[in-house]
């Protein structure tokens, strides 16, 4: 009754009557839809989701030419009443995206008995008008689903089906609820058509709706519902109905449920964990009412007044999960008290005061919560600081093992618990709030986490789910998957144990610990000392011993007895020492000894909740197998070995553990008991009693499951024993277990020649022989280029890697000496790793050096400043400006340039020959009109002036002398008039043909358009090449970074620091932990080496390709289409150095126009004569009924000739089938890539992973992302520009202006006579002065001679004075 009252308070708006919705004059009942959620009765829950809204209208459009459309929606539901009519639904993005998936669903009008529908989830290249379909053909590509599915509806059965989506998750509501994932769908638009309202009324869903459900019995008849209007969000997010088996329903959003952790918290990812997610009982409680009760771990959950929501488990709980919406609910004074198995109570007390915990319920939310533990036994209390709790608490988890988690993180570890006492008062301000208690057990689950919150959860408790968990995937595609040992279908291997037979003597080591509690309060403890076999020191002399304890403690009357604890600094404790641990020597002492570890014994004070040291046992021990600790005496001769021969077994042989097949051999060895390889692997062992040698061959029991349509239909195993399937069939190399014994003919799974059907049947598939097509000749449609554009394509090819060397020992051990000793046991592991990298680097360096050479002469030729161009210099023989006059012309003549009519001026010059007198006689006629050139020099001007003056001198007598002047003037005026006429006609032609004057501009625009288009394509190739360069430069850095990151992994050791491990543990335990690190780091290192070797192989192949491209593209012209530049006919190529490779610039002719023709391989004449083209590179095709021949590279059709053909034997085309093994015989250099990789991997060393400080690695990354994005943006902009130019070209009319040109006439005008007279006078004066100077100066001049004569007469014959000349030597 209280349970009903609870939900009357929380679900204040629940009305438990059937709620029908008006739908096209019909009512819609949603109980059948809600029954698909399998909510276990009795339950009262709030169901939230993208569901039909009972208050919204349904779309009932049935017109043939109309479609209903919804935008911004997240789902569509269909209501069916009767008549079995058809419908069509299409779902896509609002802005159609052909690169993503769309959904199409169509149901024909085909009744209800065997009705079906077509469901497709594909990528359609363009928008489609929503219409029906009648077959499986579709224009969609890359379909995830293209099926013909059952679609039978039942009349008048309240059937509502639908599809909803949220991000990538798509949900189908049909016979049950199905979930699957369509990546990046971004659906938001629905288009639908319905042929009849009774069959397919539609409702589009765009928001979450909440319904109150009251489930009393299974099925639709036991469900009542109504729309929830109050506190709905919280109820739907936190309360669920537990499914059968304790599973949380998949629709639960896991709000306020966290992944428990004792260390770090997972932020994002998928992980497999063992945590308390199996729910025995879920109880929802209102905060208004509060709760005070005790929850026991030894019995099923029982909350007085409340019952479980959904399925109710009968087992006891391992953990209680408290899902709270109020932080104060669990941090208040005495809200949570833990009852331990030894009777101690531990309560959690929180306060806003860090120094003094107070029992107060008035905590301030804006201040930190300082929490303490109050440990009490009787009236004694011990308060210790616990931690600072988070300001917001959403989940509180308490396990029976004494762990307390807050929001998923562990805050308290205490002793195992028997119960939890709650005292949750109704102090919250949110009186309408609620919280839940879930009694849970630990189970194996797969969890997806995002932002530390649980997104999805999968229970690994079924064979199918176990496979999914092993693959860390919530959905698996059909295929074959490995089966783990925890799968119920897995076959376990027998265990082999071999040890030496021993004759044992046994002894007991008795440890006595004593002490007394007095009667004071709290009681005080006094230790009486510790004895070993009633003494102080015992060394074991037998080869077996058992350690026993006797606690002799005196207790007061109010204390419990026999509560002891212990701690150990030894690699064992008081219990595990008897579990067949072996020693070389071991001694026990009650006083400290050199090299001894300690076992300390404590007695617990149940009144004061304080532990007291009762005694200490010191243990000295050495490694060996002489002495064994046993739980009981095993005296006498004992051989407990157990052998399983000739089968794959898990063995423990003389301490070696592994999996192998043990076989008896005929070999004998005198020495040794077991025999190993150089690497330490067990090869054989000896039976010391009989001397027989047994070999050990490693084995692995391989088992795979055939997974079809989310279920296991069969198991492939190497073992012939299984109890889960009805049939076992034997095949070469394996056994197949299934429930279907028929032979599979239409397989769903195919691997090699094995096929598995949906039912689990298996069959061997025979290869199908290809039937040769017998026909006269083959023909088909091909495209031949008709036009080309020149383009530059950029290509990058890597030539070498950066060499990497790894110090294996330093990487694995980080300089730790003890770790290096352990590493030496791995024999050649480090040697193989280091040598593999070094040999690969040296081999690559040698190949690169032999490939690349440097030519000094070529470098000089490439530099313009150093190019030896010779000593040619033509500046002295060429004019300064083209077309200039000579110097004499510049001095003697003035040049006048005018326009002339046709050939008038040239004819006039030839006639007059430069004589002015012949001016009028050489007059020319143009179009019947006499004309003279318009320019007259001075001679002509004076001549016609004299003629005019002469005609005027004597009046009428001499008037005829003026006629030449008149004729000349009229002729020259005619010349000017005709020039004007030509100019006018040119102006008229310009005006008439302006609209077609842009033809050259159009051609220019077309050229610019093509250039921009090719530039855009070129920029794309540059961006791709730069992207490859960036990947090459950064690829190795990423690998090294990943290798360094592995150093953070502890590989299941307690720490990733070797020094830290040895500082915290004893040597034996630390060696085991460090061995895990060594194994893991070697695995990481081997993975890096394998990746590096693979990269070396890839670069070697690219280096070979680069050499081919240099020879074929750079040094010659490639005949191969697309080999140099991806597409087009190759012209020439250039190469440029790039980081770790070469950048090729290929100039190619790219086809930009094609013509489609029907090509034929040859001609068959009367079925007797077969003819085909003789020359390669040509194609024979049919066009308009005519046979033509054209080069394949360029469409140049012509009629075929006899010389073009060669006759072949027959018209029949023959096919030759060969096997893969025969291919190398036909093609010797053929390489089977898969086989080569298998051989490489088989020869690689057994490799592993590393651990180093992250600051050791420093790698600079080349980031060209911005440049590449910029190039791509520019390319896109150029492409858009070319489209704009194309539009402009279409808008320009073709125009052509053909002007009538006037000749350009050059006339040289002679200077007048007085100019020449002045020139002559000037020359006479200059010559006179020069002559005078010559005869008047010098010793031989006239003046000089006369002066000498006159001087001799006056002075007589006395010679003139002169100075003597001295000889001067010049050195």
Curated annotation (Swiss-Prot):
Question: Its Gene Ontology biological processes?
Answer: endocytosis involved in viral entry into host cell; fusion of virus membrane with host endosome membrane; fusion of virus membrane with host plasma membrane; receptor-mediated virion attachment to host cell
Give the Intravirion compartment stretches of this protein: 1333-1371
Q: Report residue spans for region: Heptad repeat 1 (HR1).
A: 963-1082
Q: Where is this motif: KxHxx?
A: 1367-1371
Q: Which UniProt keywords apply?
A: Coiled coil, Glycoprotein, Host membrane, Host-virus interaction, Membrane, Signal, Transmembrane, Transmembrane helix, Viral attachment to host cell, Viral envelope protein, Virion, Virulence, Virus entry into host cell
Q: Which residues form a coiled coil?
A: 1030-1074, 1260-1302
Q: What is this protein called?
A: Spike glycoprotein
Instruction: Show the taxonomic lineage.
Output: Viruses, Riboviria, Orthornavirae, Pisuviricota, Pisoniviricetes
Gene that this sequence comes from: S
